[in-house]
């Protein structure tokens, strides 16, 4: 009798892409940081949108809106802490992702490496404009 994950049409797709994925043995945990960057970015976008629904940037009411988010919004404190810690986790994953590329010599693929460096500078400029300057 064969496994249901290999015979069921829907589970077969999931099995072939996640469980029995034909991947090289040199694929280590260092290669997960690209997908972790995607997860962190998704969390940042979602929590940022939900926080922006209640935040006011006026200098007279900005602090009051932050306390409103933490006290009155359902799980507002969780959104705020996920957004703050998600930014730190995003940069940790970003630097580890670039470090892995340096370690394995990915800079020899000049076109891909240059696009990655441009993305790195764009992310750093965006974060500087959005988090440091205000």
UniProtKB/Swiss-Prot annotation:
The protein's required cofactors: heme b
Chain residues that bind heme b b566: 97
Free-text comment on the cofactor: Binds 2 heme b groups non-covalently.
Pfam families, A to Z: Cytochrome_B
Annotated localization: Mitochondrion inner membrane
PROSITE patterns: CYTB_NTER
Cited InterPro entries: Cyt_b/b6_N (IPR005797), Cytb/b6-like_sf (IPR027387), Cytochrome_b_N_euk/bac (IPR048259), Di-haem_cyt_TM (IPR016174)
Transmembrane segments: 33-53, 77-98, 113-133
Molecular function terms, GO-annotated: metal ion binding; ubiquinol-cytochrome-c reductase activity
Record's subunit section: The cytochrome bc1 complex contains 11 subunits: 3 respiratory subunits (MT-CYB, CYC1 and UQCRFS1), 2 core proteins (UQCRC1 and UQCRC2) and 6 low-molecular weight proteins (UQCRH/QCR6, UQCRB/QCR7, UQCRQ/QCR8, UQCR10/QCR9, UQCR11/QCR10 and a cleavage product of UQCRFS1). This cytochrome bc1 complex then forms a dimer.
Record function comment: Component of the ubiquinol-cytochrome c reductase complex (complex III or cytochrome b-c1 complex) that is part of the mitochondrial respiratory chain. The b-c1 complex mediates electron transfer from ubiquinol to cytochrome c. Contributes to the generation of a proton gradient across the mitochondrial membrane that is then used for ATP synthesis.
Family: Belongs to the cytochrome b family.
Protein name: Cytochrome b
Species of the source: Sturnira tildae (Tilda's yellow-shouldered bat)
């Amino acid at each position: 009798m064969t496994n249901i994950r290999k015979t069921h049409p829907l589970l077969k797709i999931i099995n072939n892409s996640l469980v029995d994925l034909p991947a090289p043995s040199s694929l280590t945990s260092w290669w997960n940081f690209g997908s972790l960057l995607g997860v962190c970015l998704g969390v940042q976008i979602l929590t940022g949108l939900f926080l922006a629904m209640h935040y006011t940037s006026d200098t007279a009411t900005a602090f009051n809106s932050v306390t409103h988010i933490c006290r009155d919004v359902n799980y507002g404190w969780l959104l705020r802490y996920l957004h703050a810690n998600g930014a730190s986790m995003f940069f940790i994953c970003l630097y580890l992702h670039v470090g892995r590329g340096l370690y394995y010599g990915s800079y020899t693929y000049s076109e891909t490496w240059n696009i990655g460096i441009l993305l790195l500078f764009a992310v750093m400029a965006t974060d500087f404009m959005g988090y440091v300057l205000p």
